[in-house]
Regions:
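Signal peptide processing junction and immediate N-terminal pro/mature segment
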Residues: 19-25
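Bacterial N-terminal signal peptides that target proteins for export
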Residues: 1-9
Length: 160
């Protein structure tokens, strides 16, 4: 009986923590690809591309990407990977400030994630995965045709 009375406060505290908004946010964040967080860069001759992703927090990861040639910017976009109120995960892309397009998640593993929207013109499929220390990205049509691929290396921020 005494053990039960002593255990009761711990059980109540655990129940309150699991029902707290912080615990709910942590559960949402766990559904996001935290392994993508960081600053990533690719250079191939004069062509360059980079992506920046925030840590998963509050059920969302924010991203920004840009590509260019030499000193000229060719394209840019803002992106989000977020957990929607129904618990599903989607990728949202806004190329050059245009309205956002949604790509629901269709596949997820420890080091890969894929989003698809067959009704979008191009891309229809967006895939990210880790290959060792590289962040790989690919966009294509839903059947995998017209694929474009990037292999990003992580940029380490300067130390103070």
């Amino acid at each position: 009986m005494l053990k039960t009375l002593l255990a009761a406060p711990a059980l109540i505290a655990a129940a309150l923590m699991s029902a707290s908004p912080l615990a709910a946010a942590d559960a949402r964040d766990a559904r996001l690809p935290g392994w993508m967080a960081g600053t990533w860069m690719m250079e191939d001759g004069a062509e360059w591309s980079d992506e920046l992703w925030t840590d998963a927090r509050g059920g969302i990861m924010l991203g920004v990407a840009r590509t260019g040639f030499g000193s000229q910017l060719q394209s840019w976009e803002t992106t989000q990977i977020r957990v929607k109120p129904d618990g599903s995960v989607s990728f949202f892309a806004q190329p050059q400030g245009k309205p956002a397009s949604e790509f629901p998640m269709v596949l997820r593993s420890e080091e890969a994630i894929e989003f698809a929207n067959a009704n979008h013109d191009y891309p229809q499929r967006i895939r990210y995965w880790r290959q060792g220390k590289l962040l790989m990205a690919e966009i294509s049509r839903i059947d995998g045709s017209d694929a474009q691929r990037w292999n990003y290396r992580q940029v380490v921020p300067p130390q103070d």
